[in-house]
Amino acid sequence: MPETGQESSNPPAKESPFSIKSLLTCEPSRAVRPHKALFTPIKGALDGAAFALSPLTDLTFPRLEIPAQRFALPAHYLERSPAWWYSYTLAHGGHTPRTEVPDKSLLLGPTSPVSGGERDSPEPIHPLKAELEAKDSESKSPEEIILEESEPEEGKKDDSGEDWKKREESPDKKPCRKKKTRTVFSRSQVFQLESTFDMKRYLSSSERAGLAASLHLTETQVKIWFQNRRNKWKRQLAAELEAANLSHAAAQRIVRVPILYHENSSSAESASSAANVPVSQPLLTFPHPVYYSHPVVTSVPLLRPV
C-alpha cells in the first residue's frame, strides 16, 4: 500500500516535442517562443521610427533571416528597390529606403554590368563627371568660342548679301514687266502714213525724220508703225497666196460627169444619121472612149477622145 501511494504521487513525464503525437498534432513548438521575443524590440523600434538596422552585425539572429523580413514588405516596393543583398536601413513604417548608387558606380565603372533592379532606376549624375565637363568648358579659349558662334553669323551675312543683290536686280527687271504704251494715231495721221506706205515700203532716215516732223510724231513712233504695217502686209500676202492655192486645188477636184444619150422610139433613125453626120466634140472629155452596145451599130463610139 505505501508503495502504491508513492507511485501515484510521482508527476507524469513530460511529452517530448519530437514525439509522434506532437508531430501529428502540428502544434507550435515551444522552442520558437524565444525567437519571437527576439523580434519584439524590433517591432517597437519600427513603430517609434527611432531604430535603424544599419549595424546588422550587432544583432544576435543570423543574417540569413533578413530576406524573410524583406519579403514581408509590399510587392510594389520590391520591384522598385535595388537588390536585397545590399546593406539597408528601415525607415518609418517598416519600408527600407533605397541605397544610393553613386558609390557603386564609382567602383564598378561605366562599362560594368548592372543588375536588373538598377537598370530600371535612372542613372545618377556623377559629380566627378560634372567637374570634368566644367574644366573642359573652362579650358576652351575665348577665341574658339567666338569662332563657333561666328559661323552661323557669317552664313546669315551671306544670306543677307544675296537678298541685297536680289533687291538690286529687281528694279532692273520691273521695267521689262511693265506693259508697253500704245500710241493712238488720229485719222489724218493714219491716212498720211498709209499713203506713204503705198508709195514706199521702206523709208530712209531723212524721209522718216521729215514724215515724223510733218505728223508731229517721233521718229521711233513712225519707225514702229512702218514695221507693224510691213508685218501686216506680209501676212495679207501669205493669206492671198494660200487662198489662191486652195482655189486651184478645188478646181482640180471637180468631178467630170459623162453625157448620156437616152434611147427613144426612133433609135434606128438616129443611129443611121449619127453614122453619116460627124459627132461633135462634147464639152467634157475623158481619156478613154465610152462604148454603147446597139443591135444595129455595135462598134460606133459615141464619145471620141481628145
UniProtKB/Swiss-Prot annotation:
SMART domains: HOX. Its main location: nucleus. Keywords: Developmental protein, Differentiation, DNA-binding, Homeobox, Neurogenesis, Nucleus, Transcription, Transcription regulation. One of its GO terms (biological process) is cell differentiation. Residues 117-143, 153-174 have a biased composition (Basic and acidic residues). One of its GO terms (cellular component) is nucleus. One of its GO terms (molecular function) is DNA binding. Residues 95-181 are annotated as: Disordered. CDD domains: homeodomain. Residues 178-237 bind DNA. It holds the Pfam family Homeodomain. It is found in: Nucleus. The keyword Transcription regulation applies. PROSITE patterns: HOMEOBOX_1 (PS00027), HOMEOBOX_2 (PS50071). Transcription factor involved in specification of neuronal cell types and which is required for inner ear and hypothalamus development. Binds to the 5'-CAAGTG-3' core sequence. May act as a stage-specific inhibitor of anf1 in the anterior neural plate during the development. Belongs to the HMX homeobox family. This is Homeobox protein HMX3. It comes from Xenopus tropicalis (Western clawed frog). The lineage of its organism: Eukaryota, Metazoa, Chordata, Craniata, Vertebrata.
